[in-house]
Structures are given as C-alpha cells and as structure tokens.
Regions:
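Signature of the chorismate-utilizing enzyme
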Residues: 1-249
C-alpha cells in the first residue's frame, strides 16, 4: 500500500467492501500492504508481546512472522497429518478476504507444529512423531521479494466490530513503520560469546549429516511428505545469549 494512503481512505475502501458483501459474521482476513522491512528486527520487537509466535525466513521464497492464535487444533494418531490437512481446508474455505490492494497478495498460512520431549519419545514406541498442532495466526506478516503484507485473521460475530479491526490493523502498521524509534538501544557486550556459539554450532552441524540423511530417507519412502529437522544441542555459557543477535550475525 502506498505510504501516502491515509487511514480515512483505507477505512472507506474496506468498509465499502464489507457492506457490498453483506457480511454478518464469520472468519475474516484483512490485508494491508506495508513497506519492505527486516523481519528479524521486527520479530525482536514483537517477540515478548505475545504468548504464541513463530518466525520463518527463506532468502528466495516467502518469509513470515506469526503472532497470536485465531484458530488452532491439536491432532494425534496415525492420521494426524490428514486431520491437519482437513482443518486447513476448512479454514481456507471459511475465510472471507478484505484488502486494499490485491497485487501480489499472498495467501494466509496455517502453520503446523510438533513438540518433542525426551520422556514422551521414550514412552511412544509405536509413534515416533508426536501429535501436531495446526494454527491459523491472528497476526501474520509476510515478506515475498520486496513486498510485505500485514494480515489480521479474526472470528467476527458482530458486523459492528469490523471497523474496530480496521483500526487495529492500522495501529499495527504504525507500530511497524515507527519501530526504530520504539526500540531500546542495547549494548553488544556479548559479541565474543556469540562468536564462540557460532563456532560451536558450525562444528556441531557436521554431526547432523546422519540425521538429515535419515530424514530424507523417510520422505523418499513416502512415510512423510515433508519435514523440518530439529535437534537439541547443549551449550554452556556464563552470559545471557541473545537469540536475535545470533540470527543477525
């Protein structure tokens, strides 16, 4: 969305869309184009503000920040992935989109998670993959190339509250645009600790090859369709380790 666009124009445009659709209640998605930005820096700003958050960055593809939950459900058993797919299809079927500009508008995202705990794995002989949770984020910031979009998903049960949602997404837009003035400046006192951690991580990555090959083999066998490999590492430090400084270095 052009930076010179005013809230009055945005409010008028989407309110007209809302009235023309005769919408009363249900799942809405409101999208607003924002200036291109550094997602890691932005995630640091929002990180402690929400109980649930997720961050994913790909250099040449779609990257996102997800905050808070609009809809979520947990699935277990052998057909948990099929259950999650059905949940996703249901969500996308229900979403009613509202947007100011449609050019390059990305789709909403439902994110899948599994949590691995040592005790659970030891007691889970017949099911090496724990249950999964599927989440439709309430707030979603998506970056594709140089285009960035801010989305809000919300279960609207009263059409009178639609304008409140428009005010809310505009408020997030303003926070994002003005984030540099809102950041607290920090001293990079632990740069040496970060360098030490990166050296440790580079050495540890060599030991991950076996796990990666085993994961790829599961996909090739058709046991899994896609995977995100995770492995716990133990690292001792006497200083506070800033995860965002690690990501930025």
């Amino acid at each position: 969305m052009p930076s010179e666009t005013t809230f009055s124009e945005f409010l008028r445009n989407l309110s007209t869309q809302f009235e023309n659709k005769g919408f009363q209640r249900g799942l809405v998605s409101i999208s607003l184009k924002i200036p291109s930005l550094d997602l890691i820096e932005l995630y640091k700003y929002f990180f402690e503000k929400y109980e649930f958050s997720s961050f994913w960055e790909e250099n040449e593809f779609s990257s996102y920040i997800a905050l808070d939950k609009c809809q979520s459900s947990q699935f277990n058993g052998e057909d948990k992935f099929d259950q999650a797919k059905d949940f996703t299809k249901k969500v996308f079927k229900e979403i009613v989109p509202f947007y100011y500009q449609k050019d390059n508008l990305p789709l909403s995202k439902v994110i899948y998670f599994s949590s691995f705990y040592d005790n659970d794995l030891k007691n889970s002989i017949n099911d090496n993959v724990p249950g999964i949770e599927a989440v439709l984020p309430r707030i979603l910031i998506i970056k594709e190339s140089n285009n960035c979009w801010l989305k809000i998903h919300h279960e609207l049960d009263n059409p009178l509250f639609f304008k409140d949602l428009l005010k809310e997404i505009w408020s997030y837009r303003n926070q994002i645009i003005n984030r540099k003035t809102l950041f607290k400046k920090e001293n990079s006192h632990n740069i040496e600790e970060i360098k030490r951690f990166n050296l440790f991580l580079n050495k540890y990555n060599k030991d991950l090859k076996k796990d990666i090959l085993e994961g790829i083999d599961l996909v090739n066998q058709g046991i899994l369709e896609k995977i995100v490999l995770c492995k716990r590492i133990n690292y001792e430090t006497n200083h506070q380790l800033d995860i965002f400084q690690i990501l930025m270095n």
